[in-house]
Amino acid sequence: MNIIKELEWRGLVKQITNEERLLKAQNDGAAVYCGFDPTADSLHVGHLMMIVTLKRFDKAGFQAIGLIGGGTGMIGDPSFKADERKLQTDEQVKFHATAIQNQLLRIIPDVTFANNVDWLGNMSLIDFLRDVGKDFNISYLLNKDSIATRISTGLSVTEFSYTMLQAYDFYNLYINHNCKVQIGGSDQWGNITSGTDYISTRVGSANTEAAGFTIPLLTKSDGQKFGKTESGAVWLDSNKTSVYDFYQFWINQDDNDCVKMLKYLTFLTKEEIDELEAKHKEAPHLRTMQKTLASEITKFVHGDKELNKAIKLTDAFFTGNILNLDDDLLELAIKSIPTIQLEKTTSAIDAIVNVNAASSKREAREFINAKAISFNDVAVQDENMLLSEIKTIKNNKIIVKKGKKKYYLLEIK
């Protein structure tokens, strides 16, 4: 498989420094790397493009390396950021780095991992200036779009040095791990070319085999940034975003975005995606593309077992059969429903309003009279009934159901 052709039909080629070197690296079975800075204790769906692309290179015969930025994470990448990042403590970076590496090991276990703190952490300022800084011209750095966009608003020396540190990462992996290719999002082009240029300077332009590759940033058809919801980021950690919510995020994607996402984020073939698109055009109400997208990505990130839970829970929410779920699925359901805490002396009508199942007491009464509200599958008939009078589940919890498909969760203090 020609890796460039594979990525081209998927629409994943943004920029390549040198196609010939990239294909030579593939034929030689050289290493490729992608960096992940530990800015949080979990990656989110915005990182999936790079995780999946790294896995594509692995499947194409490269030795894939995931580089955890335990060193560069102490500084923060300024590329196209409006403001300087808040510096993290050493303890925060170590904690985040460990969490992210463990997460990636679960998702892409065949990939090798490294941490740049292993070589940057022991480098003195004198060593950095002598071995790295002397090979970078200030005017060269100022011409980088990723740096130029920050000059007018202010850029510290700390962040200014980031691209040189990343260049040294590539050089270190090139020399010690036969890593000939760095991949990243299109916002990383400046940092990646700093690396290929630095390697060329160190080993000689006639000898270098380094190449850089970027993929486009994923945006939705309406122009909005991909990966955000009203409640915030969609995380790859099931403790931060439940598997059900993760699955639903993909189920709810717009028709106009699905083909692109299937190409970008799954390993389905062109023929399989074309067939899905044709089926969708015949019967769009079945949402075949969305269901396949959700299944493929949830399986990739969380595995078959968790995917099956998400599908069963989706069916249970649709049929209104929540309380008959087994304990594991009921726990997942509870994690996936918006929750508020209320005192046991709260009345039913106040609880309905507080949980946002109704906008007012008048509307709540209308729902009660229409038998449209239930607490743990028992229709509410008395608006003055106290929460203390209701049989709870799972440590003082009450599942509030409005109509057939709207759920809320009350936890009695």
UniProtKB/Swiss-Prot annotation:
Entry superkingdom: Bacteria
Annotated localization: Cytoplasm
GO CC annotations, alphabetized: cytosol
Enzyme class of the recorded protein, top EC level: ligase
Reactions catalysed: tRNA(Tyr) + L-tyrosine + ATP = L-tyrosyl-tRNA(Tyr) + AMP + diphosphate + H(+)
Stated family: Belongs to the class-I aminoacyl-tRNA synthetase family. TyrS type 1 subfamily.
Protein name: Tyrosine--tRNA ligase
Organism (species): Mesoplasma florum (strain ATCC 33453 / NBRC 100688 / NCTC 11704 / L1) (Acholeplasma florum)
